[in-house]
């Protein structure tokens, strides 16, 4: 366990629309409200979102070394936009995706004229973070905007004459017209969100007088088939279910300092492929989405101790969170794997909970929140992608 401010943990999974008990109506309604589209359009979009990966793998190969960005437009209809460096004839494609039961046409729009590739731009994120940190002490997030082709830096601070002068100095020093640098002043800070079905609400003692709340994530297993329940490493080591008192015993963790936030616990409960999306409602995990398959504009949902079930939109993939320990100077949340989700619904004790897409596809484990220091309002959250589970020898229980 690591920090008192961390978010609760949940369990996520993939989806199968053919099974009515897998929550299609719940996600369709959420998508419709989130993007302002009809329920019919929402249903169509979720089907496309669940079946698009192979089509986009083909796009990645076709334009290898030239892609400036790939993102999702959710309204008025679902489509994929691919920005390509260099010259060419813009085009619109419809690619059949789906399964043996049903297929749909995935709209893909190819736009030429990008000035820089995504790979080269992401290779400049640390440079941008270091430059901004020369002028500001509270840089929160640095990422690449795949829609605009610019690098964005979000800094905790107010709009003042002095801060504007610093922003102008940073941009002058950056001076790269092919890769613009945008500095945004924000009123929030990035913090861990702490306050055997996945999504179980749990609490564990962290001192003689204090307990921390979290949420469990997904059922996982190692190469030998031994099953564990996952959560965030910054959550308590040992904890109990707040519902029935089931104990979860610490086995191991890979903390922030090792560019992760993964913990696994054993329990007397039967660990399955189920995860909660409501007080008594579960879904069945059917697959996972990797970091490379995650797109800006994706709709993702989470379930947590503090806020229950809610959905948001991915606004950054592979972002960095350049916060440093004021005493040692060590990075608090190292790594360039974080996925940034735009939502107003998150809170302490959501840490460790499941983040999922297309009903039952696991996206990752919820870890950090962008929290207003005055009001406590959520301005978004960051999750650890499924890659960080699999690269350490674990896999989901399907």
Give, region by region, the residue ranges found by the protein language model.
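Terminal interaction modules at protein C-ends
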Residues: 186-398
